């Protein structure tokens, strides 16, 4: 979902964001405090602590807290060391109460620490908010991203990862428009800038188990946030994402995370993303799964068997051992207006 879709105001897009700067980077792992050249602003840590104030309106909603164990705990033990993936629309940081970032941040911290995902595709995060999350996750996490209006401006499609398990090999950003490498571009009728970030990861743990270095386990993760209002823009965005995925090394599996702003199985965008046999919905393909809820709740009571607009898609060669929609809250306070979606995958 997008901010305007829930009746809230989104941060104003920065002016002059349509420059023609294009950024590509490859090679070595990135420094934790590296500042990406050009448009990118990535890996940063450190943030002020805040005091949580529980949201009375959320408590009144009567939404049940997630069961008293991490979602990944339900995944069966496997010898292949499954990768824990999460997609999470963070709800951009604001001071508006209830559900301000100051109220939500402590719950977000607890959720992420207990789940300990290896990689997280996030949506809507603002630069300072992402720095808060990086600090809360701890020094063994890093992240890649850039603001959709360029640099640190506006919302990010940032990708966090556990650097003890994963090492980035290369990454890039592109904008969902006819000019995908023009920063801040939007040409399909949408008023909000939309973009995608992808990263090629190496599984460090797997590589360490194969000391001959002849076998490396790598994969691509692409993270995005489609438009909340314009169906044409969503459909064109889906086609562009498929084109970009097809340009990547065909030998490596793909994982796609995002807020697609349409319900799974109910929209041509879903058909476009999963058609042709190149991507499958991890929720449908999972060996086991949690109860289903609408992944956007807007701080209202949860909807059992509701629409899934936040997805984790994978190459067919990837096995999803367990998929879950995480309803974790503390005293009625949710960390976001979306529920995180999680998958334990292996290949």
State what each model feature region is.
Residues 81, 154-156, 193-197, 217-222, ...:
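Residues that flank catalytic or metal-binding motifs in active/ligand-binding sites
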Residues 87-104, 177-190, 227:
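Acidic/histidine-rich helix-loop elements
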Residues 2-13, 18-28, 32-33, 37, ...:
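Metal-dependent phosphoester-hydrolase catalytic domains
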Residues 84-90, 108-133, 160, 199, ...:
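Active-site beta-strand/loop signature of hydrolases that rely on acidic residues for catalysis
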Residues 90-93, 125-129, 148-151, 165-166, ...:
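Solvent-exposed loop/turn segments at secondary-structure junctions
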């Amino acid at each position: 979902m997008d901010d305007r879709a829930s009746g809230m105001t989104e941060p104003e897009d920065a002016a002059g964001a349509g420059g023609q700067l294009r950024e590509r980077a490859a090679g070595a792992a990135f420094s934790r405090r590296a500042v990406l050249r050009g448009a990118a602003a990535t890996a940063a840590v450190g943030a002020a602590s805040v005091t949580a104030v529980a949201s009375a309106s959320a408590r009144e909603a009567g939404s049940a807290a997630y069961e008293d164990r991490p979602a990944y705990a339900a995944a069966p033990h496997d010898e292949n060391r499954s990768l824990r993936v999460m997609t999470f629309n963070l709800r951009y940081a604001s001071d508006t109460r209830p559900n301000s970032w100051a109220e939500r941040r402590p719950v977000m911290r607890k959720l992420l620490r207990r789940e300990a995902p290896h990689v997280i595709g996030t949506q809507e995060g603002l630069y300072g908010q992402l720095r808060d999350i990086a600090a809360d996750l701890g020094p063994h996490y890093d992240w890649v991203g850039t603001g959709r209006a360029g640099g640190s401006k506006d919302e990010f499609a940032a990708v966090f990862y556990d650097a003890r398990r994963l090492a980035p090999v290369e990454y890039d950003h592109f904008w969902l428009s006819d000019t995908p490498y023009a920063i801040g571009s939007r040409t399909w009728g949408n008023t909000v800038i939309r973009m995608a970030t992808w990263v090629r990861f190496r599984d460090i743990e797997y590589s360490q188990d194969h000391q001959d270095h002849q076998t490396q386990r790598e994969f691509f993760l692409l993270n995005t946030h489609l438009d909340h209002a314009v169906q044409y823009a969503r459909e064109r965005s889906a086609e562009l994402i498929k084109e970009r995925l097809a340009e990547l090394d065909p030998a490596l599996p793909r994982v796609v995370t995002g807020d697609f702003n349409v319900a799974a199985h109910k929209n041509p965008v879903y058909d476009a993303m999963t058609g042709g046999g190149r991507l499958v919905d991890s929720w449908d393909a999972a060996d086991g799964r949690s109860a289903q809820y609408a992944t956007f709740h807007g701080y209202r009571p949860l909807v059992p068997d509701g629409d899934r607009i936040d997805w984790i898609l994978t190459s067919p060669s990837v096995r999803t051992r367990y998929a879950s929609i995480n309803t974790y809250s503390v005293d009625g306070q949710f960390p976001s207006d979306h529920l995180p979606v999680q998958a334990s995958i292996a290949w």
